[in-house]
Amino acid sequence: MNDADKFIIRKAVLELAKTGTPRFTSIDDDVRNLPNVNSKATNRWDYVTAIGAQLSRPPYDPYRETISLDISIGRKTSRKVTLNIPLIIYGNIAIHYSSLESVHLALNQLAENGNVLGLISEIEINTTRDNKRKYPLFKKVPCSPNGSLEEDYKKSYPEGLVLEYKDETSLMILQNFRKEFDGPILVDVSEVFPLYIKTILEEGADGIIIDTNKVTKNKIYQGKHAIAVISDARKAINDYYKGREENDDDNAILVIAGDVNSAGKIVKAAALGANVVGYSTSMLIAHSNMYSEKPSDISSIAENVYRHMLGTKGEIKGIPAALGYSDFHNISPSDLRTSSIDASLQGNIPLEGIDRTYKDMIEEVVNEYISEKGIKLNSSETQQVLRSIVGE
């Protein structure tokens, strides 16, 4: 088998891992249609880049400082869970238990070396060689109105819980679990976003999980990109805290999953407002094993996953370092630039060469026109005019 054949097979495996379904088009067709594909909303990430270090922020000096990736999960009333790398591994499709064992071994090895990641799973993964879990488990709990944590909690003692929000019944379950569990509770709102964020946070949820792939299939976000979902989710959380007494210990986090399966996308998602990125188990295994010629047994996959995550850690530290930050979580939309008007509108990202968002430019023109014509509009009316112009 030559290298070209291997590449085709690996690309097909990655496609299967990402979508859960086989390919229905040939790679040759994809190459021919590349210009058309790049013009679609699904590739807006390619039009967003991080700018270099500013004069007001000296470049990162490796001799004097280190880049912190740490993130604490848990609000003021909850027990905190700290991740050394802002990633949580989660299962997006059913995969073989042996693959989960490999992830378990890799996460343990990472934790032993000070690189703690989280895992979202319905079950606790054990192996015959290493039964003790050394990383935080966020256990998925069933949406049963009469559900109790006692039985599940005794079995696995998870550091956190994950609840999928479906309807008002889910809110009752959250209320019950909040009374029983003192660790962080994350609520997946992918099926109902952008609704109920404020209510869920008021009931004590420690964070929101959003799968951009699911949300962009909803009617509200049809034709939009993950950039818009992340930006709107961050705004929803920020709006919840407006007018409230500032408290550094009360920080609900945003976990973004879905279309964030590379180091570059992880950094861009963080700049747009994600505190933690959900990295799918299937994509993790597929990416880490992409260039390996070794037999895919549990140990070799675990080693590949371990090395892949260390490589990813190095990559996501590099960009904030170039921006002059010592804390990964200090990056923001102002550190990004885009050549796409759509990306600028959806993510409130400044345009390249102008350093202002497209919306800011339109707002300036509208305000000048209103002033020249002597038109009197209040703030709400002005915003309505802007929305009609930019198509929001």
Task: Name each model-derived stretch.
Residues 1-112, 117, 127-131, 152-153, ...:
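Conserved, well-structured core domains of diverse proteins
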Residues 77-79, 83-85, 91-199:
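Active-site-facing alpha/beta catalytic cores
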Residues 107, 233, 316:
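Aromatic/hydrophobic pocket-lining residues that form π-stacking "cages" and hydrophobic walls in ligand
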Residues 125-126, 193-194, 251-264, 324-340:
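A glycine-rich phosphate-binding loop feature that marks nucleotide/adenosyl-phosphate handling sites
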Residues 126-128, 216-217, 285-286, 336-337:
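Short secondary-structure capping/turn micro-motifs that flank functional sites
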Residues 158-307:
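Glycine-rich phosphate/ribose-binding loops and adjacent secondary-structure elements
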Residues 298, 305, 315-318, 328, ...:
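Internal helix-turn-beta structural module
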